[in-house]
Regions:
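The Walker A/P-loop phosphate-binding site
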Residues: 1-64, 76, 84-88
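Phosphate-binding/switch region of NTP-binding enzymes
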Residues: 119-184
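Phosphate-binding/switch loop-helix module in NTP-utilizing enzymes
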Residues: 72-125, 130
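Short, glycine/charged-enriched secondary-structure capping and boundary segments
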Residues: 31, 58-61, 109-112, 144-147
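Switch/connector loops and helix/strand junctions flanking conserved nucleotide-binding motifs
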Residues: 53-55, 78, 105-106, 138-142
Length: 184
């Protein structure tokens, strides 16, 4: 994955992570959360649709005492407002806006002005702001876009051991492509 993100998720900007179910999108977000909390950073997970699983985060060794989990009850507008307020409040190393459960039509209708506002707010902080969804929504407002696509399962004998994922990133219109295998 380092080949795709070229050294990690940038701070002080908006990154988009997109992919369908089983693409590794949530696993990557939980890995980021785990790394940030283990380094002593406070993090926020804005959960638009109540899909965050604390047990999965614990399994990845995330420190849940360093996590503020905001459940927006299926309301994307509330999630955007919460993200805006929390990124402006400062003090967080990672802010995740999880729109994965939001209907695609709703996510596409988020105005570019909202994305520009979030990007501008992130630029005044040291936080990594990551928006996750089924598709790229913020378009030109994000500095890094990572698109994941499931490729094929990885088998050892008759046991499923992981999944191969194709990833493509766009960094201010420079495209990098790589593939990686997630094995448990």
């Amino acid at each position: 994955m380092d080949d795709v993100v070229s050294g990690g998720i940038p701070r002080g900007t908006l990154t988009e992570l997109a992919g369908p179910e089983s693409s590794g999108r949530t696993a990557l977000l939980i890995t980021l959360l785990s790394q940030a909390t283990r380094q002593g950073e406070c993090c926020v997970w804005i959960d638009t649709d109540g899909m965050f699983d604390p047990a999965s985060a614990l399994e990845a060794h995330a420190d849940l005492d360093r996590l503020l989990w905001v459940n927006c009850g299926g309301n994307a507008e509330h999630a955007l407002k919460a993200t805006d307020l929390l990124i402006q409040a400062g003090g967080f190393g990672l802010v995740v806006l999880d729109l994965a459960g939001t209907p695609e039509k709703t996510a596409r209708r988020i105005p570019l002005a909202s994305w520009f506002r979030l990007r501008h707010a992130a630029e005044r902080t040291e936080a990594a702001l990551v928006s996750a969804g089924l598709r790229i929504n913020a378009r030109s407002c994000s500095s890094l876009q990572i698109e994941l696509q499931p490729a094929r399962p990885v088998w050892r004998g008759k046991l499923l051991r992981g999944a191969r994922v194709n990833a493509q990133s766009t960094v201010r219109f420079a495209v990098r492509t790589a593939a990686f295998t997630a094995v448990k």
